[in-house]
Structure formats: structure tokens, C-alpha cells
């Protein structure tokens, strides 16, 4: 058996790679690990999902695995990933399980496990769970020792009370378009923004199990741009399928990505004395423009590998208060143990109201260098990335760029892709060099 856990839990095409049998085994193995690491006593796991059709099947299988090993399953239903992380701590549960493939297409699904307090698992714990999956379930409890299933009727309301803490001023007078990606934020996202006082125009908020992320949400911004312009809104916020991301568009329909959002929030927190050690944590994918803006403001930037788990690790290690990714995963440990798209949207709007400035004006503190990202589908990521022809193409591009840009080649942790990213002083050079490297990757893969 190959490694199950990727950079963001276990993912695959539902009912093909990620089967009900595997979901049951993961539930049982996670329960076994908990028993072996915490000793005797009744244990509880929070279980949530996004609305994709396969989630019902996988939820049932995960819960069967948990209860078969004596763990009570607290079922919270369709809620964002950060809600499950928060509720794991709020309910004083032993761990949490989220069934979602985030921004991936509908046929995919995934299983993400949170430890106590809603924190992501470390590699050692994931390895232990994998070894228990391989070993099989072992002895099972019987009678009253079998776990029970409890529906948490107040889960959404608890989460909404939590996210309301992100909004330190009323948003009355602000008009926002919210793209829910037909995903987990479809109910709670608009409710959160309305509760804060904003006038909300919701789009793509009618999930049917099949339409999640379908030409909508944070990976397809055409609809929200059009809606912002059509309604004369102050901004738009777009979430992905599990609502751990937030991207924005300003009143002109222009993108405000995760880098620009981090700059806006970092400056706000620095002004309020809330930016711990005057430090922002981000990944190698962040635009050079972010680094320049932060340097000008006297903010340090700590850089990690790609993936919010690495951002989270650095935040915890340094006791920092803000980090994130260009893709819109923004983490504020004071407001949650993982990225929360709704919290991010509320903080962004709070800054607009507090300053009286438009989103375009706030985001203008960062000047984005032209950046081109090409996703290349490959059969073998390791072989393609290491191919001499690919390395030669990268060397040629780096020679041309010199110190005026950079190139990054990164295998995806969740999909059969290699991401080619090029930043350059002008758009033409970025496109040309990215295409030349992507062509080499495609030929090698």
C-alpha cells in the first residue's frame, strides 16, 4: 500500500481510490490510535462534510469505523472545514474528521483528521494511523462499549457565534457578493456576513451534491466579478468547496488574492499592535510584491513550503499571529486553528469599514509582479520534475531572469500535476518562460 496521507489528508476519486472500505478502515484506525495514545475512557469525534454526493457514503463509512472501535461520533452535517476544526475544541472532542476534497472537482473526495483542539495531525501520527489501517481492526468492543451516533443540532449556531468574533465593527452600509461554490459555506457564509450587518448578495449557494466547485467559487472568479459589477457592490468574496479559502474582488471586479489580503491584514494588525513579532508567515508561492510591501512596512516575512499545514507549523513554532497562502488560505491563530474563509472575509470587510477605504485602495499597498502559473498534468511527478530536459529548461529560464524574477517548479500534493510558476518584470517574459518550462515538463511526464 502506498502512502495514504498527502499534504491535506487522504484524497482520491470517491468510490475508486477513496472507497467506503478505506473510509471505514481510516475511521477505525484513527479510533485505535486514539485509544492507544490516551488510555481508557469514552471518546468522542466530531464528523462533518461538504455537500458533494459521495460525502454521504463516506460519512457513513467513517462513522461506522469510529463507532466500531468504541468512539462516539458527533455528527455536525454540512459545515466548512474550519467549523469542524473549531467544533472539535468547542465540544471538547478527542479529534475531528472532515470529509471534503476542498476545491477539487465533484468526483473527488477526501478525509481530513484533526487532533485535540482542532489542530492538524503531524507526520508521526499520520504514519501511525496508516500502519493501523494496514494491520486491520483487531479486537472490537461489543454491547454498550460500541460507539453511538449523536446529531449536534447546535453546531452551525456555535460556529457562527465563533466567527462573529472576527468582526470588531458593524458592516452596515457595505454591500458584498458572496460566492459559496455550491459548497459547505452555502448556508453559514451568507448568514455570517448578514449577522455582521452587510448587505449580502449570494451566488452559487444552492448545492445539490453534484455542482460543488462547478465553474464557481475561488477557482472560477468570472461569476463573482460579473455579479459585483452588476450590483455595484463594494466587494466580492469567493470561497471554495469547504470554505477554508477566501479570495476577493474589488468594486472594479479586479482580483485581490491571498497575497494582497495578507498585506491588508498584516498592516491592520501591525497598526493595532496585534502582529506578533511584526512577522507574517507565507509560502514560497507568494509574489515578490508581497515581500517588497512588507519590507517597506517593517514587517518580517517567514517563508515555508507550499501547503497550509507548513504555514500552521511555522505559526505555532514562532507563536506568530498571521500567515497564509496566495490561494486564499489565511490563518489567524487567535481566531482559529486552521484557515477560515469566512473569518478572512469578515476581517477584510472590517478593515474597509474601519478605514473608510475601498478594497482597491487597501490592496494597492502591494504591487504584484507579473506571475504566471501553469498546471501540467503528468503521469509520474517525480520522474518529470527530475528529467534532465526539465532541469535544462529551468536553468535557461533562470539565466534569463537573473535577479529580476524567479521560477518555481512544484509537484502538487493532492493531484497528478506539476505546477510551473514564473515571476518576471513584464508579462510577456513571464508567459514565455513559463510556457517553455511547462512544455518541457509535459514532454517528460
From Swiss-Prot:
Q: Which reaction does it catalyse?
A: alpha-D-glucosamine 1-phosphate = D-glucosamine 6-phosphate
InterPro entries per UniProt = A-D-PHexomutase_a/b/a-I, A-D-PHexomutase_a/b/a-I/II/III, A-D-PHexomutase_a/b/a-II, A-D-PHexomutase_a/b/a-III, A-D-PHexomutase_C, A-D-PHexomutase_C_sf, A-D-PHexomutase_CS, Alpha-D-phosphohexomutase_SF
For the ligand (Mg(2+)), the binding residues are: 102, 240, 242, 244
Xref: Pfam families = PGM_PMM_I, PGM_PMM_II, PGM_PMM_III, PGM_PMM_IV
Q: Does the entry feature the keyword Isomerase, yes or no? A: yes
Query: Cofactor comment in the record?
Result: Binds 1 Mg(2+) ion per subunit.
- Modified positions (Phosphoserine) are 102
Q: Name one GO cellular component term.
A: cytosol
Modified after translation how? Activated by phosphorylation.
GO terms for biological process, alphabetical: carbohydrate metabolic process; peptidoglycan biosynthetic process; UDP-N-acetylglucosamine biosynthetic process
Q: What is its EC number?
A: 5.4.2.10
Q: Which GO terms describe its molecular function?
A: magnesium ion binding; phosphoglucosamine mutase activity; phosphomannomutase activity
Q: What does this protein need as cofactor?
A: Mg(2+)
- Give UniProt keywords alphabetically: Isomerase, Magnesium, Metal-binding, Phosphoprotein
Q: Where is the active site?
A: 102 (phosphoserine intermediate)
Sequence similarity: Belongs to the phosphohexose mutase family.
Q: What does this protein do?
A: Catalyzes the conversion of glucosamine-6-phosphate to glucosamine-1-phosphate.
- The protein's name: Phosphoglucosamine mutase
- Lineage, please? Bacteria, Bacillati, Actinomycetota, Actinomycetes, Mycobacteriales
Amino acid at each position: 500500500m502506498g502512502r495514504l496521507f498527502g499534504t491535506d489528508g487522504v484524497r482520491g476519486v470517491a468510490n475508486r481510490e477513496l472507497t467506503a472500505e478505506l473510509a471505514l478502515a481510516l475511521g477505525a484506525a484513527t479510533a485505535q490510535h486514539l485509544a492507544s495514545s490516551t488510555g481508557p475512557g469514552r471518546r468522542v469525534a466530531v464528523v462533518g462534510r461538504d455537500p458533494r454526493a459521495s460525502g454521504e457514503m463516506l460519512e457513513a463509512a467513517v462513522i461506522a469505523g469510529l463507532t466500531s472501535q468504541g468512539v462516539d461520533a458527533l455528527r455536525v452535517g454540512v459545515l466548512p472545514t474550519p467549523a469542524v476544526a473549531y467544533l472539535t475544541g468547542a465540544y471538547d472532542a478527542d479529534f475531528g474528521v472532515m470529509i471534503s476534497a476542498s476545491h477539487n472537482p465533484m468526483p473527488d473526495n477526501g478525509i481530513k483528521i484533526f487532533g485535540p483542539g482542532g489542530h492538524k495531525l503531524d507526520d508521526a501520527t499520520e504514519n501511525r494511523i496508516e500502519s493501523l489501517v494496514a494491520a486491520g481492526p483487531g479486537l472490537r468492543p461489543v454491547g454498550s462499549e460500541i460507539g453511538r451516533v449523536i446529531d449536534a443540532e447546535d453546531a452551525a449556531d456555535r460556529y457562527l457565534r465563533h466567527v462573529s468574533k472576527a468582526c470588531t465593527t458593524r458592516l452596515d452600509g457595505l454591500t458584498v457578493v458572496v460566492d459559496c461554490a455550491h459548497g459547505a459555506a452555502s448556508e453559514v457564509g451568507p448568514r455570517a456576513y448578514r449577522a455582521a450587518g452587510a448587505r449580502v448578495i449570494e451566488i452559487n449557494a444552492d448545492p445539490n451534491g453534484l455542482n460543488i466547485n462547478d465553474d464557481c467559487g475561488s477557482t472560477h472568479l468570472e461569476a463573482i466579478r460579473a455579479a459585483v459589477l452588476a450590483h455595484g457592490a463594494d466587494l466580492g468574496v469567493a470561497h471554495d468547496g469547504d470554505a477554508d479559502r477566501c479570495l476577493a474582488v474589488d468594486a472594479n471586479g479586479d482580483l485581490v488574492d491571498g497575497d494582497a489580503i495578507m498585506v491588508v491584514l498584516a498592516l491592520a494588525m501591525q497598526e493595532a499592535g496585534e502582529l506578533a513579532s511584526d512577522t507574517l508567515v507565507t509560502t514560497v508561492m507568494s509574489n515578490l510584491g508581497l515581500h517588497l510591501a512588507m519590507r517597506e512596512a517593517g514587517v518580517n516575512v517567514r517563508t515555508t513550503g507550499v501547503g497550509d499545514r507548513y504555514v500552521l507549523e511555522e505559526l505555532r513554532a514562532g507563536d506568530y499571529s498571521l500567515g497564509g497562502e496566495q490561494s486564499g488560505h489565511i490563518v489567524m491563530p487567535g481566531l482559529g486553528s486552521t484557515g477560515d474563509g469566512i473569518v478572512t472575509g469578515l476581517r477584510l470587510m472590517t478593515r474597509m469599514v474601519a478605514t473608510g477605504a475601498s478594497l482597491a485602495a487597501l490592496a494597492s499597498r502591494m504591487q504584484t509582479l507579473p506571475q504566471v502559473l501553469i498546471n501540467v498534468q503528468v503521469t509520474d511527478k517525480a520522474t518529470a520534475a527530475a528529467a534532465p530536459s526539465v532541469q535544462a529548461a529551468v536553468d535557461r529560464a533562470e539565466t534569463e531572469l537573473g535577479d529580476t524574477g524567479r521560477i518555481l517548479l512544484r509537484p502538487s500534493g493532492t493531484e497528478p500535476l506539476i505546477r510551473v510558476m514564473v515571476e518576471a518584470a513584464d508579462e510577456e517574459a513571464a508567459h514565455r518562460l513559463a510556457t517553455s518550462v511547462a512544455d518541457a515538463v509535459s514532454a517528460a511526464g
